[in-house]
Swiss-Prot record:
Annotated protein name in UniProt: Membrane protein insertase YidC
Any one of the GO CC terms: plasma membrane
Assembly information from the UniProt record: Interacts with the Sec translocase complex via SecD. Specifically interacts with transmembrane segments of nascent integral membrane proteins during membrane integration.
GO molecular function: membrane insertase activity
Keyword Transport among record annotations: yes
Main location: membrane
One biological process term in Gene Ontology: protein transport
Amino acid sequence: MRDDNTRNTIIFFVCAALLLVLYQVFVIGPADKRRQAELARQAPPAAAAQAGQAGAPAAPQVPQAMTRQAAVAATPRVKIDTPMLTGSLSLRGARIDDLYLDRFRQTVEKDSPPVELLRPEGAQYPWFAEVGWVGANVPGLPDSGAVWTLAQGSTLAPGQPVVLTYANGQGLTFTRRIEVDDRYLFTITDTVANTTGQPVTIAPYGTVQRQGVPADLGKNQIVHEGAIGWLDGKLRQVKYGKWRKEGGGPAYNSTGGWLGITDKYWLAALIPGQQEAVTGQFRRTQAPGVDVLDANFVGAPVTIPAGRQVSETTRFFAGAKQVPILRDYEQSLGVAHFDNAVDWGNFWFLTRPIFQFLEFIHRYIGTFGLAILALTVVVRLIFFPLANKQYESITKMKKVQPQMEELRKKYKDDPAKQQQELLALYQREKVNPLAGCLPLLLQIPVFYALYKVLTVTIEMRHAPFMGWIQDLSARDPTTIWNLFGLIPWDPASAPLIGAFLNGPLHLGVLPILYGFTMWLTMAMSPPAGDPIQQKIFQLMPIIFTFIMAPFAVGLLIYWTWSNVLTLLQQYVIMRRFKVDNPIDQIIRKLTGKPKPAG
């Protein structure tokens, strides 16, 4: 039995190490290479539209980058002012390209500036939305360089729409009415009047475009960042790395749907009419020195008879991926699966219920930290019957430990006989040495799902808990190297070793508490019979303390509290079976009480 245990332990750690290596080689490594590779391929120019057909306009040539303020000031603008958004839209191209999210800050500091969402072309890393019309052999359609006239309104605000006009001088007059609600949705209604004296065929289009990708995006493998949309009845996603390297993939014929570009917490997405036939596509082209990424759709061609006009309505979402708001738009506007803009992942059947539970509890207690504690209790209750059997088996193992040691000593020269006698002892005492594995394995998907929820949902970003914890989605900000802030010194500033102290060796309060509760939990279990196993198990709390240190505080709260509940359950069972345990030993040392007889 000892040899089997040793072999199983070694196999476990070898497999775990192999999985980590494979993940590094086939996931992390290629992703890093894609980010670091120099993009030298030049995308072929878009093919000219055939007679009677329309396609998305070609990507523009990107001008040399200027400051954001200079890029905003370079074009005439209309101010945008809502309870959640501020910025402006450009009259050149009638683009929505300058937005800040006023209710979200870049850091947890009170004086931190608001999050910047969209930025105009000409600045570094522009990100904007544009809608309009395309058509073959139709001269004078307004493009990105067309300057519109503000015909009505002065500031775009809820209940205060603006109207823009553009006359191409060739018989077509374009009128654009733009509305915005008190959250994140713009409604754009385009009307085209035909006074050319002959029918004109054009098609509506829309594009969300990003030129270049900031270096801090696309590095988290668990989070989808890049192209996203619901087209042809399916969720379509292309990560930035693949998008830049391989292009965006095929065109999708769809009825309605939505598409755009997403980051971890933010989304810019176009929503065409939900009953209209559209062709959506994620496209990559190149301008000098930069990738041009755009998510675009083209609607069905519309023929406007002479003397008539047509109208087309497109909506544009630009804001934080707050699940209740996404669901409200999904229900009120009929936007299919709009809450899938949040990356629920392959374990969506766990991540969604976990988020809904946390959201429900949060409404009543006001903090997601306490909601995580409540979630932990619920998970423990679900696994209670199984865990109870596990801890009873562990307690029995600890109780028969002296007999096991005697058998090992008695038959140390006869491994076969030793194993036979140990198996007989397990059967006689109704002990299962493997009973402790199953509950832990069953909790791993829950742990991963909670990790996903904490990572991708905006509700967890900058969510405080207590004391020093101001962001449940970030690592513990304290560090042992300055005594958790008691010493006014930043370990990251230390010469040569600062990067290590602030990186792999960063240890905060919660990781240390987690490691201590893990050590105490393992101390409550019977010691391994093999010396190698004993050393491995002694090192595991230390190893996992460092492994867990970079994880989100919310995860550490969950796992540490789970360890505490495990200890309480295990302690009660051990007291019931009258088995001595480390907690009683610590209490006796602190109080000076003798060990009870028997």
